Amino acid sequence: GRPETRIACRIHDECNGSDVFGSDICTCRPYLTHAIEECILGAQNGGVGLVAYSRKEGRALGEVTKFLVYNARKRQVGGDTADQYFARTECVAGVQDMRFQELMPDVLHWFGITKIDRLVSMSNMKYDAITGSGIAVGERVDLPDYLIPDDARVEIDAKTAAGYFTSGVIPDADELRKAKGRGLTT
């Protein structure tokens, strides 16, 4: 690529439940649509927009395991809370996340990308893999609060408290206990 060309980019990890079927337990679909809008805006302003879709369903644990985790979250004593978000995955799957992001930037290198002006991602694993592969990142774009579904508040609060990038407020331990998802009967 040409160094003067501005690039907006999202590497999106597959989420059939949200991306395809519209589940609101996570922020995947709103983040994907927000990224597409950001990429279109970048292209309309003379730059390039790129969304790469990675087949890493359910943090690379697979769809069945992801749905087992969702079930455990909704059925746990006290309900689905942000302070237990990662613990439920670890309890069901033995790990919090199986994604190996170190090879993910290969698709960017294949396109000749040496810098990303606007990385539409809150994931530090993706950011670290991209910058660690020699691609410079200018600005990180988080998901605006108004796009976060109510039931996904559990996910986003847990992730930002765990260190995911945000330009907003990082919830403390009390707020994590209060962030509660929809129950089984609602």
List the predicted regions and their residue ranges:
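Catalytic domains of riboflavin
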Residues: 1-186
